UniProtKB/Swiss-Prot annotation:
Taxonomic source organism: Bartonella tribocorum (strain CIP 105476 / IBS 506)
Active site, UniProt feature: K79 (charge relay system), S159 (charge relay system), S183 (acyl-ester intermediate)
Enzyme Commission number(s) from the entry: 6.3.5.7
Catalytic reactions of this protein: L-glutamyl-tRNA(Gln) + L-glutamine + ATP + H2O = L-glutaminyl-tRNA(Gln) + L-glutamate + ADP + phosphate + H(+)
HAMAP family per UniProt: GatA (MF_00120)
Protein name listed in UniProt: Glutamyl-tRNA(Gln) amidotransferase subunit A
InterPro entries registered for this protein in UniProt: Amidase (IPR000120), Amidase_CS (IPR020556), Amidase_dom (IPR023631), AS_sf (IPR036928), GatA (IPR004412)
């Protein structure tokens, strides 16, 4: 019998519609897979088995009556950043210890409305701050991928490492994730999965724990481009509760897959050729260029001159917004409370014990750049640079370019015990060098697997699109996927 967890969302959907499969059977298969994998991979921080069974049974009842939502009976994992009513929501931080919200995020509400089943909450970097999923209060996530002939434990990327690892390990059909500077696309590239950061404003941020509010955007991680397109259609919506939500129709992204890209203009930015970049990343990029050229696209060399300033300005803007957003966590009404002799000491004790080192580092940086005497020199200048980064992209798209192709990451996944990266914050931050400019400009970006490194690890390519043109980058990503194929990790943990 086919292992039901190997089915894509599209395949499972079709099997459920034709009654070859029941939602309860599919859910039980995933719960069993989680039971086998999670003690090793640590992808889930909460498993909602009984809730999943109940939701699946309700899906079966609807399917029996010929009623079905877009994701009817499809079991999903939810990043621990999304508020889920009555279920553990802690942003993988000790400071939110025991917090169970009495409300539902707009995105998860959309998914449940469409019939999806919740398997549980997924591990992540604390408050989404990290690129390796090592800053979580619940410990690191282990990637399902390994180097050839090696037992070294690898990172799945971050901050959505639990989402990417769970999808790659086939312990959920798809997952929600968030991306502030690359937290969907980098883990997707590291794990051979597909991840899209939609245009800022496409998906509601209501009920999603904030990191940097002007940069945060939610999106899906899935096994292939089609599954990603199906998930985004359900997740995206206009929401009056989010002042940055944009009231535009949500296309049927899946319907664009398989359409010709003949005549499309694809930009190749010279600034993304970094000094010291590995030859296999350059070769992968060239391979992607050739695939698109063979599919009829026109390749154009372009310049994004302010790209090199995007990362340093991001690491001023994001911590500044984080220090403001995280000021609300004080131990008074919910989460962790560490007693003190007075209220000030209680605040200090709670925040000192509740926040991890990386979160404290970013709060300190953010508070510093917003402080009197440094605001103009730091934060204000960084915002001006952000405007220039966005202007570069605008000029490029105004010149007729339909999408931009770049590598997704400068390297494949690295080891959990890699002290060089672990002890060097800048080296860790450089993981986001190709992804951060997209967040700074508020554009859609997708990471699609395009090959394997010499060590047998996944490598991804990134496509960047015009605002609210996610269907175009899905269309192009599908071409790359057809040429590159699908990459699956061996289940060494069973």
């Amino acid at each position: 019998m086919t292992d039901l967890t190997t089915l894509t969302i599209a395949q499972a959907r079709d099997a459920l519609i034709t009654k070859k499969l029941k939602a309860t059977e599919l859910t039980e298969a995933y719960l069993k897979a989680i039971e086998l994998a999670n003690p090793t991979l640590n992808a889930y921080v909460t498993i909602t088995a009984e809730q999943a069974r109940k939701m699946a049974a309700e899906s079966d009842r609807r399917l029996a009556k010929g009623e079905r939502g877009l994701l009817e009976g499809i079991p999903l994992g939810i990043k621990d950043l999304f508020a889920t009513h009555g279920v553990h929501t802690q942003a993988c931080s000790n400071i939110l210890d025991g917090f169970k919200p009495n409300y539902e995020s707009t995105i998860t509400a959309n998914l449940w409305q469409d019939g999806a089943v919740m398997l549980g909450k997924l591990n992540m970097d604390e408050f989404a701050m990290g690129s390796s999923n090592e800053t979580s209060y619940y410990g690191p996530v282990i990637s399902p991928w390994r180097k050839k002939d090696s037992n070294e434990k690898l990172v799945p990327g971050g901050s959505s490492g639990g989402s990417a690892a769970a999808v790659a390990a086939q312990i959920c059909a798809g997952a929600t994730a968030t991306d502030t500077g690359g937290s969907i696309r980098q883990p997707a590239a590291f794990t051979g999965t597909v991840g899209i950061k939609p245009t800022y404003g496409r998906c509601s941020r209501w009920g999603v724990v904030a990191f940097a509010s002007s940069l945060d955007q939610a999106g899906p991680i899935a096994r292939d481009v089609r599954d990603c397109a199906i998930l985004l259609r359900s997740m995206a919506s206009f929401d009056e509760k989010d002042s940055t939500s944009v009231n535009l129709p949500v296309p049927d992204y899946e319907s664009y897959l398989g359409k010709s890209i003949k005549g499309m203009k694809i930009g190749i930015p010279k600034e993304y050729y970094l000094a010291g970049m590995s030859q296999e990343i350059i070769d992968l990029w060239q391979k992607g260029i050739n695939w698109l050229k063979e599919a009829g696209a026109e390749i154009r060399d372009i310049s994004l001159p302010h790209t090199k300033y995007a990362l340093p300005s991001y690491y001023i803007i994001a911590p500044a917004e984080a220090s403001s957003n995280l000021a609300r966590y004080d131990g008074v009404r919910f989460g962790l409370r560490v007693p003190g002799k007075d209220i000030i000491e209680m605040y200090e004790n709670t925040r000192s014990v509740g926040f991890g080192d990386e979160v404290k580092r970013r709060i300190l940086i953010g508070t510093y750049v917003l402080s009197s005497g440094y605001y103009d020199a730091g934060y204000l200048r960084a915002q001006k640079v952000r405007t220039l980064v966005k202007r570069d992209f605008d000029q490029c798209f105004d010149s007729g370019v339909d999408a931009i192709l770049t590598p997704a990451t400068p390297t494949p996944a690295f080891g959990i015990a890699d002290e060089k990266i672990k002890n060097d914050a800048v080296a860790m931050y450089l993981n986001d060098i190709f992804t951060v400019p997209v967040n700074m400009a508020g554009l859609p970006g997708i990471s699609v697997p395009a090959g394997l490194s010499s060590n047998g690890l996944p490598l991804g390519l990134q496509l960047i699109g015009k605002p609210f043109a996610e269907e175009v980058i899905f269309q192009i990503a599908h071409i790359i996927e057809q040429e590159a194929g699908i990459f699956c990790a061996k289940k060494w943990w069973i």
